[in-house]
Every structure is written in structure tokens, then in C-alpha cells.
């Protein structure tokens, strides 16, 4: 605009009122007549300087129009009747043509697009006209930035501000490119010179064209920034749902993040230093945590009304079958983007083509494939020189992992190099180069994948080989796969049976299938003839943990999944394994300075109190070149197993090998010991010598000693050699046979120590003929074989010393954890002493295994019946039913029951979330707000959001005790009624329940209660609803008669008294020892936790205990039992069941 024209009044509009505006070159903030700001809330205060002095004034954020163009700016109140405009709020009034550093060849890009487009000639000419019409939309200069006309984003930090970071050393070659970017952004107001307490380092990244991209390392800032709830959809999900029609277009928004303004209060967080001067961003910077989500949300919202459009960050995709429609919708997109203030780069855009590149893939009408650009990158890959280059190559390959069936196996050896790397160095071999080329060749020849059709069921074909699982996904009518999935089994999974490996693969396949199913059923085809029969797999054949089996079996109950047998699938087992052995080739024994042959043996111990007696044998020999024995040892080990003897023998040999200069070979005939030492020992050493259950290894001290020897002397080789072979079977047969003989000799050596009888004072007095209390005089007492015996009518019995009696009881009881009488009979076969029954009862009451396993012989008191609320809407009971079979996208039903009347409301939801609960309750609370809401302790009801919602409305939240549905009996009974009624109405069509919810709600609310003799509708409204079998007399009553009848009905409701307690019931008291029931005990696991103390009695049926984890918990006594022998039971964990100890430690 001519500067003289700025002196003229400008037409403006505020809140629908037209008035005049004046451009003021000296104004730093726009002034609006104060009458327009009376209803606005100030966002801050600022100091305003005028010719009359300085004054603090409120600042508002207002939207208004100048010359028909929308302006959003910070404003202050003015006593005048016109607007005073600040030049910074309307820069377009004096806008000059943009002049930046590098001009892009726009005409060349437009010609390329017109030449490549598949549009007919008529639409091609229309496209050419659009290029001219929307010239302001295209990027004319590199680093050109749009200006999104929205309220500026405010970057909020957490409790602590980020720490300023030092600038990295910058490559001198990058400085010219970065300086151009900074100069261009300063001209457009994207950057502003400003000092800040924060600093983020600049990290230039080279581009393929030789220039450098300006990137800032905002990791320190991002640590303090709360992540926004709305995040971008995964690219795989977008590719599965985009519309693939004949004509396709992709548009690239240039520098989209930099188009979004941020508030001045956020500038300081974005600061960086360049050439000794600090700059701050006035727009969303790249690298900021929430930039992609904020930008994408805005772009999606802008284009939501345009059909067949998909947005992913700065990439826009649209497709149509009709060329005329495609051009029409394309112009609509151009118009929206121009009005919004974005800039489009035609360099990367493709318009009206049959095949386009989107999210790194070639998008065709049938599916997607790898682009030529990606394949060229693969061909240019060279062997890596360090760990960083290897990780970069694997990242590139991983992008296309779903295009070949055995990708994970092919790259397994390359991933192993990362684990074995030493710092940044890797051991790259010629075999690795061949394997890398094999992967690249497979990807370059990979076929296109089919698109996922949302109206068809998803088909999964699953199979496995000994080392990996294979999965293919199809549309039900499709011939090409949607994608491949390959899973290499872990070290633990390699030990599974083939059935368990197949179930592991199926589990991995179904996790991915839940995203691909898009609400449709999933058909799983596998070599398993009957999935129901695998539940009967015997426990000895199960090598996986029980928790895995529980997870696998849950899929059988999922109504969305159907399992089928496909006899053609076993052919997949013939896919060759990609396996590289890590065991070095064997050397001849003459190449070692010493050879140790080891063996361990165990026999049944001659001592009846012990089970085994072990020994080990070691032979030290040398081949020089003839076999010569240097030394040999036969060592008894006492009460140990043969496995422990094998490990001890190898440990002994390793310690002796430390004194031998040069390489040493240790031979063992135990495959377990050799495999563990060569393959498992490095992992055990790294994880602290614990197994998969996080328990210490058996014989941990021996393994630690072996690991220490191998670290001190790495040239010790431990090798397995099969034992008990004929002479001359192998070069080590003679040494193995001698070691076995020495081990057997050691196992036959028994150390026998003669013990004197240990008699206490009581038995000593008895043998001296004195009368001792509890010992009948008529029997004869004597000493024989060091033991005191008594002749009784049932035979001769041993009287053990008092110190041994507890051990005898525990030994007899622990054999099978028998009850009182069975244990007493077992002991009475050999022993007798006074009060033997009393001692047995006392010791059994202290057995932790029985305490946490046996059922309670006490019953809890009678159920407390809570008082019925005095009037409707006083108390609501709420709960979720589900998951149900999917019906119109819904899986759950929120059930709300009025406590006084039993009136029920049903709300379908997609998930049992807090937001769904609040949304449903908001509808109901528009009628009346309850005083109390009772629920279980589900996540949807215990979140802080739900608590805040209830607090705002004065609602008290009440929760039932865990694992005690009786506390929410009213809603639980309604749940069972709803499920039963839905099942009856939906026979043969379980996915149609959504349409029947109103019918179910009407039926429940008009069903008579056998106890109360009224329906919930009558209790709430006083009359029948207009339904069949309704009492027609009540429908014609006046309102006064309705209220009178309703009062009579409610007054007639009586509160049934609490039933009397049974003779076996118990009542809790403070300080009492009780045991809590395990919520969902697995097979062969304890049913009760260890004893806990009652801290507080809330009511006769609810207490607060100090649970087994040390936390205070509210529990119903239905889930408790009193501990036997309150005074004689300790609460320490020394004798606690080892299973529970493991659970606590994990």
C-alpha cells in the first residue's frame, strides 16, 4: 500500500460492529474501544508509555477485521471510538515483495508436474490455471515460511526449567549454509535477536545436495515439556486406511512448523547461539517435543471436510477416481491452505498421477511397494566401518521389514554384531558382507503388498521352524499379502516344544492383527488341527512358563478370533534357517599345554538320613605328542548330586589350569556343564547369576568361580565329550574313562562320625529311675543304641530329646503336609513322648505352606445390608460390562443403578475409560446430581480426573473392597440380568446388542422385584410406564394422587434385619493375625498370603490390615481367615513359603 494511503481511515469490524481504524506508526500495541473489551478476560498486564506518563494496563487477546482481513492480536482498551493499529499487527499493509537468498526454479517444478500427470488434457489445463491462480501458495524461495493465522502456542514447562547447554563444535563447511538459513528467517520474523537464560546447541546435518540442514538439539528442553495427549497416528495405520483410487496427489507443506506462532513468553525456551549472538524462535521450532502433534492436528482440522484426504505431519495425500472431481477437491485444498497461511513446496509434490510416493512407499491402486529412491539407497550401501554406521544401515533395512517373509532371520547375524561390539568398533567379516548383500537383494526383488480392505475380514497364516516364526496377513478375498512378519525366537523360546513355538508366533501375530483388523473378525490359519485340544497338553510337555500358557489360552475365548486348520502350512517349515555357529573349530589336544578330563558321580548314600553321596575325578594329562598322565585326583564330596559333582570337577580343573602357561583344554562328559560354560555363562555373569525367574542359580558359587577363572585365563577351552564310550572311540576316551573311575571311587568314600547320645535333663532323670511328670510309672524306660526307649502296649517306642521333637514333627509333616491325625499316626509308628498331640497341633499351626494353602474352617459374619437411600438420586451404583462382541464400534456398557429405586441406565462405550464414564454421567446429571457414587476400584473410577469431576459437583465417591463384588451387589446383580437378557435376545447374532440396549433398559426398569413387589419405574415415578401389562389405573392419576401413591409405596419399603451369625462365624478385632486370600491363584500356588495384623476395624465386615507387601489395605473379611494359634505363630518371613518370597523379591 502507498504510505500516503495509510493516512486515510481503514474499514474495520469488531464483534460484528463496523468502525474505523487508523494506522499509527508509533504504536507498539493495538488500541480497541473499551466497550468491546468489557466481556473479555485479560491475559496479562503491561506498562504503557504515552505523552501523559506511564501506566499499567490490562492486555487482551482479540480477533477483529481490518479491510475484511482477519487479525488476531494483543490489544489494550482505549477511550476513543476508533481503533489505533500497531504496524506489527498488520504487516501486510506495508508489505514489500519477499526477497530471500536462494530462488527456487518454480516454473521448472510446474512443468515437471504437468508432464508427469496422468490427468486428461482438459484437467491438465485446469491444473495449469491453478498454478497461476494460487501463485502466493507456492514456495518461491528456499527457507520461505508461511504465517498460520491462529492463536499462538504457549510452551509450558514442568516443575523445573531446563538447563542451558553448551554449543557443540561446528563443521566449518556447514557455517555458510546455516548463515543463509538464519538470515532468511530473520527477514521473515521467524527468528528474533534476544538474550535468554536458556541455550540449545545447533547441530548441522548434511543434505544430499551438499548443503547443510539447520537442526537444534532440544533434548534437554523436551525433558521438561509435558507431552500433549493428542499424538500423531502411526504411519502404518495411515497406509492401511488411505483411499487408493485412480488419480493420486501428494503435497508437501514447506517449513510447516515455522508457520505456527508461539507466545512471547515461550521465546526464551527456544534460544540458541550463532556466531556469538543469541537468537530466539517466534514460531514452533523443529526438534521440539510437541511440534509434530500440534502441526498435524491443525492440518487435519483444516482439511477434515475434504473427502479422501489423509495428512501425516507435512505430507498431504488425496485420491479420486474422477479427474474432474480430483481437480475440484484439489482447488479446495489450495484455497484452504492459502487462507490458513501455509506455503506448499512443488519440489516434492506429485499431482494427478497413477502412482505416487507417500510416507516412503509407492502407493498404487492395489497396494504399496518400495520406491526407486529407497532401492537406490540400498544399492549404495557399503560395509560399515563402526557401530554407528552399522546401526544406520540396519535402520534403513528395517524400514522395509514387512516386505520379505524371513527378514528377521536374515538380519539376525548383523544385529548380533551390535551385542558383541567393543565400544564403537565391530568385527566385520566377509561373511557379514555376503549376508548384507543377501538382504539387499531380497528387498530389491520384493513384490508389492496389497492394501488393507476395511470391509473384509483379516486372514492370518502362521507357521514356525525350529528357530523362527513366520506370519502372513491377507484380506479375506486377497491373493497378495498385506504384510509379512518374521520373529526369531529368544534363547528361552528356543527350548520350547514346536507347539509352544507356534503359539508364541501366533501371539506375536495377533498383537499386530489387532491394529490391522479395523473392527473385522480375525481368521487364524495354522498347522494346529484343534486349538481346543491344546488345553489338555500334559504339564511335563510344557516347557514355557504358566503365564505364557494363560496368555495363549485367552485367545480361545476372544469372540473376534476364529481358528482354522490349514494342512498346506507345514510346507513353510522348509524355509532354510539362517544360523551362524559361535563355537570355534576344535583343535588337536597337542596344541594345548595341558588337558584336564573331568567327571562327577553320585551313589545312594549308605547313611539312611541322607540321599546321595558324590565324588569327582580329575585327570591332568599332556599330548607331547603321546598321551601322558601328569596327575590325577579322586575327591569325595559328601552329600551332593551328580550334577553338582560335574560342575565341581570343572571348577577344580579351571583352578589348576591357572598355573599352566599357555592354552588349556578341559573335557567334561556333561553336556549341561559344557553348554552352560560356553553359552550361558556370559549372560549369567552380566545379570548377576540369576535365572529367568530372577532366582539365584543352583551351585552359584561354583559358576562364579568358573567365570572368574575364565576371565583371568581366557585361553581355557571347555569341551563336551560323550562319556562311557568304547576304547579308541575318540582321542579323549582313555582320559574320560579314568576320570569316571576316580569319580566313582570318591563317591564311595563316606565320612562317618560316631555321635554320643544327646540326652536332656528330663530323659537323664528318667533313666536314673526317678519319677518324671508325664511319664507313666508302669512302663519300662531304658537306653539302647544311644536312644531312650519305652516298652508300651503297642510296642517299643523311641523317646526323643525335647530339642529333637520339633524336627521330628516337621519331618513327618513336611513329607506330604498332612493333617493333625495323619501326622500323629506317622510319628507314633516310631516315637512317643508326653503331650505329643499338643506338640503336633502347635507345629502344624506354624507351617506357612499350610497356612497359605488350607481352606479356612471359620466363616465370616452375616452380610451387612446397607441402609436403603431415603429418596431417588441419593446414591448411584456404577460398573462396566465387557468386553462384549464388537457392535457398531462399541465393546462395553456402563451400567448405572439408582440405590433407592433400582432404576437402571445403560450407556454403550468404546472403552472403560474415565472420559467415557464422565461423558455418560454428564448426560444423567443433567436430570439430578447424586450425593454418592459407589463403584469398584477400576481405573476408570479411581483416576484423578474422575475425582476432580465428582468434587466439582459435590459428589462423594465410595469404593468397594478389592476382589469382593458383594460390596457392589446391586449393580453386579443388574449386570448378570443384563447379560442374561442380552444373551436370550441375541441368539445367533451376538454383534447386534447395541440396537437392543433401549429394549433391555425398558425391560429392566419395568420388571417387578419379587421382594419389593414393585418395578423400578413405579418406585421412581409412582406410576407404571405405558407398556404391556401396565396398571392402566395409575396412568390416569392426577399429579397429587401420583405423589400420594409414591409416598405410600416408599414408606412401605422395610429394611430387612441382618441375619444372625452362625456358630462358626468370627468377628475381627484390632491386633488379630489374619491371612488374606490370593486374588487369582495359579495352579499349585498358595491360596492365602502370610499372616498380617488387623490395624483397624471399620465395621463388622471390613477391616484395615498391614498386607504382605507392607501396605495398609482395606479388605472384606470374606477374603480373610483368622490365623491358627494366634500366640504361637510368628510373622517373620524366615519360614514363609518360598513362592511368596520370590514374588516379593521380583
Swiss-Prot record:
Residues 1135-1146 have a biased composition (Basic and acidic residues). PROSITE patterns: FV_PR, INTEGRASE, RNASE_H_1, RT_POL. Residues 198-363 form the Reverse transcriptase domain. Keywords: Aspartyl protease, DNA integration, DNA recombination, DNA-directed DNA polymerase, Endonuclease, Host cytoplasm, Host nucleus, Hydrolase, Magnesium, Metal-binding, Multifunctional enzyme, Nuclease, Nucleotidyltransferase, Protease, RNA-binding, RNA-directed DNA polymerase, Transferase, Viral genome integration, Viral penetration into host nucleus, Virion, Virus entry into host cell. It comes from the Viruses. Mg(2+) 3 binds at residues 874, 936. The active site is at residue 24. Residues 1114-1134 have a biased composition (Polar residues). Binds 2 magnesium ions for reverse transcriptase polymerase activity. Binds 2 magnesium ions for ribonuclease H (RNase H) activity. Substrate-binding is a precondition for magnesium binding. GO terms for cellular component: host cell; host cell cytoplasm; host cell nucleus; virion component. It catalyses: Endonucleolytic cleavage to 5'-phosphomonoester; DNA(n) + a 2'-deoxyribonucleoside 5'-triphosphate = DNA(n+1) + diphosphate. Mg(2+) 1 binds at residues 252, 314-315. The record marks 596-597, 751-752 as: Cleavage. The keyword Metal-binding applies. Specific enzymatic cleavages in vivo by viral protease yield mature proteins. The protease is not cleaved off from Pol. Since cleavage efficiency is not optimal for all sites, long and active p65Pro-RT, p87Pro-RT-RNaseH and even some Pr125Pol are detected in infected cells. The reverse transcriptase is an error-prone enzyme that lacks a proof-reading function. High mutations rate is a direct consequence of this characteristic. RT also displays frequent template switching leading to high recombination rate. Recombination mostly occurs between homologous regions of the two copackaged RNA genomes. If these two RNA molecules derive from different viral strains, reverse transcription will give rise to highly recombinated proviral DNAs. The protease is a homodimer, whose active site consists of two apposed aspartic acid residues. This is Pro-Pol polyprotein. It comes from Simian foamy virus (isolate chimpanzee) (SFVcpz).
